[in-house]
Structures are given as C-alpha cells and as structure tokens.
C-alpha cells in the first residue's frame, strides 16, 4: 500500500510560482519529491534495527535548492552529463549550447531541467511531472515534451522518463541523487561496498570528456564487478574518486546495474536500468561549504551518485549509443532503486 501526500514546499521569488512537495510512503520507504526540478529532497530507509534514516543529501528548505548547488536529487536535462565544447551537429547544422562548465556544456546548460518548475499529477502510487521544453531552450533544437514519473512499490523507487520531440534533438535524462547509506550528514562513503556490472568504462580527458576509447575494466581501478570497499579501493589505487561512465549491456531491457551495501546499518541499494550506462560519481567536488539538512555539511566524498544514462558526449561520438530523438519516436527509459536490509 502506497500513500501520496501533497503539501506546499515553498514559493519561488518574484511570483515565480508555488513549489509543491509529494511524499510517497510504503511500509519500507518514504520519499519526498518537489516540483522544482523533479527533485528528491529526502529518502527515509530503515536499517536492520528498523530505524529509518534519510539517505540522500539535500536541503530542508526551497532556498537551498535555488542557490548554486551540485544538482542534489534533481532530474537533469535536456542532456545529462557533458557535451564537448557545448556544440554538436545535426543534419549539417551546428548547434551551440551554453558553456556552463568550462570548456563544456553540463547537464543541460545554465537553466537545465533541474532549475524549472514542473506540472505535477498525483497517481495512486506516485507522482508524474510534465513540462514542455520550448524550441531553442538552452540552445537545443525543437520543442520537447517530457514526463518524469516516480512510483513506489514496497522497497523500490521507480523513475520513468518519457519524451517526444518536434525536431531531431539529443535527449539524455537522469536523476542526480547523492546517496549516503549511513544517513545523510555522515562524513564520508568510505565504508560503502560498491559493485558495478560493467566490463568497460570510458576514460576521459582533463575536461572530463570521454576520449572515445571504450576501455576494459579488467586489471584497473574501474573493475567493480566484484564488491569493493570504497575507502580502501581509492587508497589502493591512489585515485581521488570516480566521475566516470561505466558501460552496461546495451539492451533496452531491465538489467542489473549496481549494488551499494553499508555493512554497519545493513542497508543495501540495488540499481536496475534500461539505460546503456551509469555515471559513478563519488562527490569529488563537494567541499563542505553547503549547509544541508539538520545542519549537515557535505565534504568531499560524503555522497555517491549512480546516474543511469546514455554515455557522455554521445551526440559527438558516433561509436557510442545513439543520442538523438526524432519526431514520431518516443524516448522511454526506466531506472529502479531497490532498497533492502541484510
């Protein structure tokens, strides 16, 4: 049984509209999602003692989400991740996007899908958000209709993304939640055990754009096919963290993507997706300056992201999975976040 409660979360400045919060509750999970950026603001998960903790980073008030902050919990688009130099070509025409993370365009530009108000509709077991991205928004061609649907089923949070375009355009939608299974506000994720079901990953240049090589994980720090404890693993390989796309099987079917286990609490997160990739990011750019929920500060490595997605810069890399959505087609992807305890 799932209950859905609708409340006001806050008012946007200068009459920009009302941001609403939707709380989805089952016996195992409670998830708060707001209509600003389709953002997950809280996710309460029980530990093996039955004690619930909030396992996502974020803010208690709307003001937190309106400041400069690293996409906590938000849906990002029209194209998640980086597009090299903020440009791409379709049918011989070059399109220019805002370069909001020098020298590239990141997560849809300066005003991506995370920084707009969506129109909500309550469902029996969740909430659906809708918006129309106008032709030319942030430099992207064509009008794009987008539906993001969150549903709850026991211990599983399901996110479905659908989109339809009036002109050929790249589309790549994901959710940018930062997880800490010890509870948000815990200082780091070093005691998290991570598994990612990927035989290959994408090496990147110094601006975090894939070089074009699809590299086997075998014998590298990127071999996460068997569980590794993050802190030890980062030390063993002398790396400062992950911010890389891992290549999953390219089938459109639901497939196992990743597993995160926090031994002390017993909490386990399993991720399944229809997408061909997942960006594993260990919060390397968090620096402790933002004040989060309950007075928490978020230093480097205090949360991890598993952003299911198409591969970064695929609009410019023909050997990557196709990036374009054409008129008459439908973009349709689903990701499942399944929580349990052991």
Swiss-Prot record:
Pfam short name (any one): Aldose_epim
Broadest EC class assigned to this enzyme: isomerase
Catalytic activity line of the entry: alpha-D-galactose = beta-D-galactose; alpha-D-glucose = beta-D-glucose
Location of this chain's protein in the cell: Cytoplasm
Main location, first listed in the record: cytoplasm
GO CC, alphabetical: cytoplasm
Stated family: Belongs to the aldose epimerase family.
Function: Mutarotase that catalyzes the interconversion of beta-D-galactose and alpha-D-galactose during galactose metabolism. Beta-D-galactose is metabolized in the liver into glucose 1-phosphate, the primary metabolic fuel, by the action of four enzymes that constitute the Leloir pathway: GALM, GALK1 (galactokinase), GALT (galactose-1-phosphate uridylyltransferase) and GALE (UDP-galactose-4'-epimerase). Involved in the maintenance of the equilibrium between the beta- and alpha-anomers of galactose, therefore ensuring a sufficient supply of the alpha-anomer for GALK1.
Name listed for the protein in its UniProt record: Galactose mutarotase
Native source organism of the sequence: Mus musculus
Lineage: Eukaryota, Metazoa, Chordata, Craniata, Vertebrata
Name of the gene this protein is made from: Galm
């Amino acid at each position: 049984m799932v209950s859905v409660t609708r409340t006001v979360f806050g008012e946007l400045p200068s009459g920009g509209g009302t941001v609403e919060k939707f709380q989805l509750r089952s016996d195992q999970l409670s998830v708060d999602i707001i209509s600003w950026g389709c953002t997950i603001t809280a996710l309460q998960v029980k530990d093996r003692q039955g004690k619930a903790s909030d396992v996502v980073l974020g803010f208690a008030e709307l003001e937190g989400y309106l400041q400069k902050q690293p996409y906590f919990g938000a849906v990002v688009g029209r194209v998640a991740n980086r597009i090299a130099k903020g440009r791409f070509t379709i049918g011989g025409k070059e399109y220019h996007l805002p370069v909001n993370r020098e020298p590239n365009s990141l997560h849809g530009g300066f005003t991506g899908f995370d920084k707009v108000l969506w129109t909500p509709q309550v469902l029996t077991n969740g909430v659906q958000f809708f918006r129309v991205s106008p032709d030319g928004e942030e430099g992207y061609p064509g009008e794009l209709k987008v539906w993001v649907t969150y549903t709850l089923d026991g211990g599983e949070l399901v996110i479905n993304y659908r989109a339809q375009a009036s002109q050929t355009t790249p589309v790549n939608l994901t959710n940018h939640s930062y997880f800490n299974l010890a509870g948000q506000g815990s200082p780091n994720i070093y005691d998290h055990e991570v598994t990612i079901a990927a035989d290959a990953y994408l090496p990147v240049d110094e601006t975090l754009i894939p070089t074009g090589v699809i590299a086997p994980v075998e014998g590298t720090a990127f071999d996460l096919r068997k569980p590794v404890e993050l802190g030890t693993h980062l030390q063993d390989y002398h790396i400062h963290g992950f911010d890389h796309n891992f290549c999953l099987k390219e089938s459109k079917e639901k497939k196992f993507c990743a597993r995160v286990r926090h031994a002390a609490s017993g909490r386990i997160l399993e991720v399944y997706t229809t997408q061909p990739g997942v960006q594993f990011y260990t919060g390397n750019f968090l620096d402790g300056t933002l004040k989060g929920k309950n007075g928490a500060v978020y230093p480097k490595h205090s949360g991890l992201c598993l952003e299911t997605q198409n591969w970064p810069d695929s609009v410019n890399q023909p050997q990557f999975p196709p990036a374009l959505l054409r008129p008459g087609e439908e973009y349709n992807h689903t990701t499942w976040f399944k929580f349990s305890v052991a």
